[in-house]
Amino acid sequence: MSINILKTLGDGRRYMKTWPMVRQLGLYFPEYRVVRATQLAILVMPVLAVLASVSQLYTYGWAFLPQALTIALFFISLPLQGLLWLGWRARHPLPLSLFDWSNQLSAKLTAMGIHCQSLGAKACYLDMALILKIAFERLDASYWEEL
């Protein structure tokens, strides 16, 4: 079980780095907001965990050490929850509508001479993110304004 959780966290980290951070995709996919929130949480939550724990220990003394540790663990768990969701989403199979749209995008990239793998039968959101990342790097902005 713990290996599966670590694999899911790793998948979430990879998916977070792969997903193109383009505002237009935020209208269609929740990943844009989740990735932004998780990146912010990775930076801010450890500091908030230390501040909350230290302030509670300073105010109430060592008798409140269990409560201070609980608060610290809560703050530290927030970015992990984002990574777990992203990891779950990365391996989640694509719906047929997104599968067709991703295959059309892949075909358009291949027609332009850009090496891009078409999606297989077990395509997942991570595969779509790879295609989207290549597409946003190579296609002009007029294509994305049509969305």
From Swiss-Prot:
Cellular compartment(s): Cell inner membrane
Membrane-spanning intervals of the chain: 40-60, 68-88
This protein's GO CC annotations: plasma membrane
A Pfam family hit: DUF412
Keywords (A to Z) from UniProt: Cell inner membrane, Cell membrane, Membrane, Transmembrane, Transmembrane helix
Membrane-topology descriptor: Multi-pass membrane protein
Domain of life, per lineage: Bacteria
Record family assignment: Belongs to the UPF0208 family.
NCBIfam families: PRK01816.1 (NF002493)
Protein name per its UniProtKB record: UPF0208 membrane protein SO_2914
Source organism of this protein record: Shewanella oneidensis (strain ATCC 700550 / JCM 31522 / CIP 106686 / LMG 19005 / NCIMB 14063 / MR-1)
